[in-house]
Design a protein with these regions (language model features):
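Accessory alpha-helical/coil subdomains and C-terminal extensions
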Residues: 61-145, 229
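ATP/nucleoside-binding phosphotransfer catalytic cores, i.e., glycine-rich phosphate-binding loops
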Residues: 150-229
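Short, ordered loop/turn segments at secondary-structure junctions
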Residues: 19-22, 143-145, 172-175
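A short acidic, amphipathic alpha-helical/loop segment
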Residues: 5, 129, 151-155
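Short beta-strand segments
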Residues: 15-18, 52-56, 117, 141, ...
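Internal gly/pro-rich beta-alpha loop/helix module
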Residues: 16-88
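Proline-centered loop/turn at the N-terminus of a beta-strand
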Residues: 12-15, 165
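Single conserved hydrophobic/aromatic residue that forms the stacking wall/gate
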Residues: 1-11
Length: 229
């Protein structure tokens, strides 16, 4: 849609906001957040920073922000990085700059890319349930820096051999997924098998990134560079 194409446009400032307390609750934050979002969107310093999320006097990059509490007004946080800036009484303060972004001209995205989260005692049962003929890609939410049980790692080989891209993120709230351990199922072995290690994103956003890449026609080394960049 034209709306989705506009998000993140270098010439437009896109700011998302909302409320954690409805208008009939004491201390409703909706109107204040709306005003803050307008201030951010109208500030020249907000140009070319991608899609922003403004809540509770903080400015976050939509790429990294996540909800951390069910009801708290300060629920939206950016793990590891922190916010890009703050809403002050008289001005908008940015103390970080957004990194350059790759943009694709896509009308829509489609494809089957499920998310599987690792757990103690996991074997190959979940991957066995997948229809490999319909599968476009897979996101693995791994332990720690990027490790999964041995049996699961062995089963991933069948996907990789069929050319199905597998991307890995950490289950941890903070930190970066990276290959550290060399045992069967460890990150080093997974990377050698062809698993992509996605930095800084959670599983849901890694899924969207992989879908965007596949719909943009990225394959092989170009796909790896984009997913791990």
């Amino acid at each position: 849609s034209s709306t989705s194409r506009g998000l993140g446009d270098v010439y437009k400032r896109q700011v998302l906001t909302g409320a954690m307390r409805s208008s009939n609750e004491l201390g409703s934050d909706g109107v204040y957040n709306y005003l803050s979002a307008l201030r951010v969107a109208s500030d020249d310093k907000s140009a070319d920073k991608g899609v922003l999320v403004v809540m509770n006097d903080e400015i976050h990059a939509a790429k990294y922000v996540t909800k951390t509490h069910t009801t708290n007004v300060g629920t939206f946080q950016t793990p590891t990085h922190g916010p890009l800036g703050l809403i002050m009484k008289q001005e908008i303060l940015y103390f970080k700059t957004a990194e350059p972004r790759v943009r694709f001209d896509l009308d829509h995205i489609q494809g089957l890319v499920p998310i599987i989260s690792a757990y103690a005692g996991m074997t190959d049962e979940l991957i066995d349930m997948l229809d490999l003929e319909q599968l476009d890609g897979l996101i693995i939410q791994a332990f720690g820096a990027g490790n999964i049980p041995k049996e699961t790692a062995e089963k991933l080989e069948s996907l990789l051999q069929k050319g199905i891209p597998v991307a890995l993120v950490s289950r941890c709230f903070n930190g970066i997924a990276e290959p550290v351990y060399a045992y069967q199922g460890g990150g080093v072995q997974l990377q050698k098998s062809g698993v992509f290690f996605v930095k800084e994103l959670n599983a849901q956003k890694a899924r969207l990134k992989l879908l965007i890449a596949l719909n943009a026609g990225l394959r092989g080394q170009a796909l790896k560079d984009y997913m791990e960049g």
